Amino acid sequence: MRACTRRHALALAAAATVVLAAAAPAQARPAPESLPGLGADFHWGVAASGFQSEGHAPDSNWRRYVDTHPDYDRYGDSVDFYDRYASDIALARDLGVNTYRIGIEWARVQPRPGEWSAEGFAFYDKVIAAIRAAGMRPMITLDHWVYPGWEADRGGWANPGMVEDWLANMRAVVDRYAGADPMWVTINEPFAYLLNEVRNGGLPAAEVTTMQARLAQAHNSIYDYIHTRQPGAMVTSNVAYIPAADPIVNGGMLDLIAAKLDYVGIDYYYGLSPEVAAQYGAFADNRMWQLPLQADGIYYTLRHFADRFPGKPLYIVENGMPTQNGAPRADGYTRADDLRDTVYWLQRAKADGMNVIGYNYWSLTDNYEWGSYTPRFGLYTIDVEADPALTRRPTDAVDAYRAIAHDSGVPAGYRPTRPPTTCSLVDALDSCADPVGLPG
């Protein structure tokens, strides 16, 4: 791994703001007056993870982190997808999307070493069957930062036997579900996985490079196995794009797995402005609703990866907007406007030749955001701490996404509610040298 911490990456980003403040941007490339839709074969999806949404959590590293951390919200049963999967999948079906991302919790299907749970697998059998019956394709995440408590007792990713333990379980998952023709995400956001393990005490800081090497080994091995069980499979490991510092943050991991990616999985959420550069790390940790939204940043993010992986399919595996307990954002952005603006820039990217094949909204419902119920990302909002019924209440983005999925994009003459950022710090040098603008 290239030596890097969140502080290092964000310090570089802050430095970039100083340099670019004096930069003179090039003239924006011509913008088409209207844009075609993204096509009938485009993947419109919603996303969730097991631990964050299922509830009824078995013993795991994250169950332990939550139970022992004094500042984390109590988990309870989260939004109880475990008992409400059928109605939640129906909500996704009614949006008109065609892809549903879930996670298979290792701790649920293998509660003890060498022993798999028939009950655990039966739950996921029902979930995947319901997704397919609703006319959607599953996207299965094998590892979304959670592993069994017995594996934590062995040292987690510091354990030399971790990769073989991991592969034994993941092969069982692949054997069971390859016939459902899912898309696959092997490991969710490897860099964030590393950071969370260190800050929660699951990994000594000295073992970060070891964990990254083991994550890469695990990805590369299960990639090959998936292709033996599901010829033509689409497999990735999604990366969380870090504005202005992505080559440093994610470059090392991508170098290790680049040969075994059928599509590039990308998570994009925030822009980066000079006003918040110095506080970016603190906001990202516990006040993410204060981070700036920058819908046009998704265009520069896609262009960054299109240049890094020429011709490779690009899929936005996660994108969304946080609020603080559902309150209006200080910047006035609504969930519907942010979604429509983002999709406009997806269409611009496709029109400019980028091989964009899919987009997942994070998330279908609010969920447990790794220690807190305060950040709300859901198309459907849920007041976990005040509403025992866990009522799913639609936000304004539900109707917006339904129209987008139906039309495969925003209308041809749509104009974003916010102009593109001059010399965007999302991809600083490129956005100054080759910026994009709006028609007129």
Question: Which residue ranges define each predicted feature?
Answer:
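Internal amphipathic alpha-helical repeat/solenoid segments
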Residues: F81-S87, P111, G120
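Short catalytic helix/loop segments, enriched in acidic residues and glycine
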Residues: N61-Y82
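Active-site region of glycoside hydrolase catalytic domains
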Residues: A31-D67, P113, A122-A330, D337-P439
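Secretory targeting and sorting signals
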Residues: R2-A28
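Glycine-rich, proline-tolerant flexible connector loops at the mouths of alpha/beta enzymes
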Residues: W106-W116
